[in-house]
Amino acid sequence: MPLNRRNFLERTAVTGAGVALAGAVGAVPAEAEGLAGDGGARRKKRYALTVMGTTDLHGNVFNWDYFTDAEFDDKAHNDVGLAKISTLVGQVRAEKGRRNTLLIDAGDTIQGTQLSYYYAKVDPITGAGGPVHPMARAMNAIGYDAAAVGNHEFNYGIPTLRKFEEQCDFPLLAANALDAKSLRPAFRPYVIKRVCTPHGRDVRVAILGLTNPGIAIWDKANVQGKMVFPGLEEQAAKWVPKLRSMGADVVIVAAHSGSSGTSSYGDQLPYVENAAALVAERVPGIDAILVGHAHTEIPEYRVTNKESGKQVVLSEPLKWGQRLTLFDFGLVWERGRWQVESVSAKVLNSNTVAEDRRITGLLVKEHRKVVAYVNQVIGTSSAVMSAAEAAYKDTPIIDFINHVQAETVKAALAGTAHASLPVLSQASCFSRTASVPAGKVTIREVAGLYPFENTLEARLLTGAQLRAYLEFSARYYVRTAPGAPVDPAKLTNAESIPDYNYDVVSGLSYEIDIAKEPGSRIVNLSFQGKPLDDAAEFVLAVNNYRASGGGNFPHVARSKQLWANSEEIRNTIIGWVKAKGSIDVGAFASVDWKLTRDGVPVF
C-alpha cells in the first residue's frame, strides 16, 4: 500500500538525528589507530568498506535455461543465477570480512524466466496460502541489504509486486515511484545502513533507490491512475541533500537506468530513460551509482560532477547474475566525521565459480516443478521452425506468432463495427535461439518464442501510418552498398537498435532496400497484390509494449484502441496450440518481405 507520512517514518525508524537506520554491521579498519611518524603524530583513522551489487536478475536462480531445458550457455560462456552470485558473495565476505560489506541490487528481479512466471501465474505468490517467491527466498538467504525497483517488477501487476515486497527481508527502494493521488513515495525512497567500526564511530551508508520513468509507458495498464514516475535526476536532487543532512557519510544510488543518456520512448516523456550518468554529472553528493536496466557490462565508469568537481564511480554488472559489482570505498576520519577518500569499482564473473549448494538446495523443489511444467507436451508441429535467421529473413517462426495474433484479434472483433477491416499483425524476433521442432511440441518450446510478458491489443491505423511504421522499423539495418559483401552478423542492430525493436508486419508485402538511407527504404509495399492505399484503414494486432510507445514507433501509441487482452501473448500462443493440437506450418508460412539492394535480393 502507498506510504503515508506516519507509516513512512515508522518504517524508516528515524533516530534523534533524523537518520533512517536499517541495521548495523561491525567492521575492521583498513588501518589501525595508533601513533606514527615524527613527534608521535596520531595516524588518521581509516576504514575500508565494500558494497557488492547485482542487477537485472530477471528471475534467474539456477544456471539453467528453461527454454532449452539445459544448463545456460552463450557464445561468451557466461553463467547465470543467484546460486552463482551467492558463491561470489561468500568469497568476498570471507576476504573482506562480512561486517565490512553490503549487498544491493538495481532492479528487474521477478520477471524473465519460466521460474518467475510460474510463481506469478501458475502457482502465484498472491494466492491464498501461496508460496514465497523463489527470488525472495534466495535473496533473503544470501543476505541482501536493499534493492531498487525495476520496470519489469510491474509486469505482473502491483499486487504481485507488493506481495514480493512483503516477502523480502530487505527494503525495495524507488524514490521516483509516487502514489498518483498523494504524490508521496509508493515505496521506501532510501535506507541508511549503520556500519560499526572498532573506533566507536559508525559509518552511515545511504542507499537511494531510483526506478525507470518508462514504466508509465511500458506498464501503463498496471500503473495508470495508481503511480507516477518522475525523472531520476529530479528525485535524486531532492533526496541526496536530505541524506547528507541526515548524516550520511556515503551515498550510493541503485538506479534502474542505463548510463547512455538516451530514451527508447523519444519525447513521449520529459524524463530520460537511461539517466544514470546524468544523475552523477548533475547531482552533487553522490559517491557511487549501481547502474541497471541496460544489460551492459561496465566494470568502472567515472563521471565528474559539474557542481562539486568530484568523481562519481558507476558500475553495471551486466544481467541475470552474470557479474557481481564490487565498489571499494576508502574512508578517513576527518573534521569529526567519516569522509570518502577513494572509490573504485570492478566486476567479478560468475562463470568462475560453482553454484552455492545452499541456494540450489533451498529451491530444488521449485526448480523441478517448473522443469516438469515447461516440458509438458501440448501439440505437434508439421515442420521445424527456427529463429536463427529471423532478424534478416521472413521465417515461418515469426509468421506463426503473427498468425496466432491475427486470428485472435479477428475473433475478438467479430460482430463489432470494425469486423470487416483487414487485420495485420506485428511481431519481433525476441530470441534468435528460439526453435520449435517437428513432431511433439512442449510448453517451453512455444514459450521460448515470446519471453516477455506482453499482452495483445488491436489498433486502428491507415496505410500511410503503416508505411511510416515500417520505415521506422527498417532503421534496424546497416546501410550496405549494392555489390558489397554482406555479413549477417553485422547487418542488423544499426544505431544499437535491439532485436525486439525491429518489427515485421504480416498481411502486407514489401521490400527493404538496405542500400538506401533510413527513412526511404520501404519499396513495393502492397496489400493483396495492389499498391497500399494510404487512406485505407487496417487493424494492427500489436503487443502492449509497442502500443504504449515502447520503441517510439510512429502513430501506434496515439492510434485508436479497438480491443485489448490481459492474457500474455505467450499464453495465447500456448492456448492456441493446445486448442488446435497441431501446428500446420504450410497453412501460414510465406515470404512476404525481403531485403534488397537496388531491387536485387540480398539473400
Which role does the model predict for each range below?
Residues 2-19, 26-352, 397-407, 415-416, ...:
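Acidic, metal/ion-coordinating pockets
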Residues 55, 197, 212, 259, ...:
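Short, flexible loop/turn elements at secondary-structure junctions
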Residues 376-394:
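Glycine-rich phosphate/diphosphate-binding loops and the adjacent beta-loop-alpha structural elements
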Residues 42-50, 60, 73, 80, ...:
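Feature captures C-terminal
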Residues 202-204, 386, 509, 531:
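Short, solvent-exposed loop/turn motifs
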Residues 364-375:
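Acidic, glycine-rich low-complexity/disordered segments
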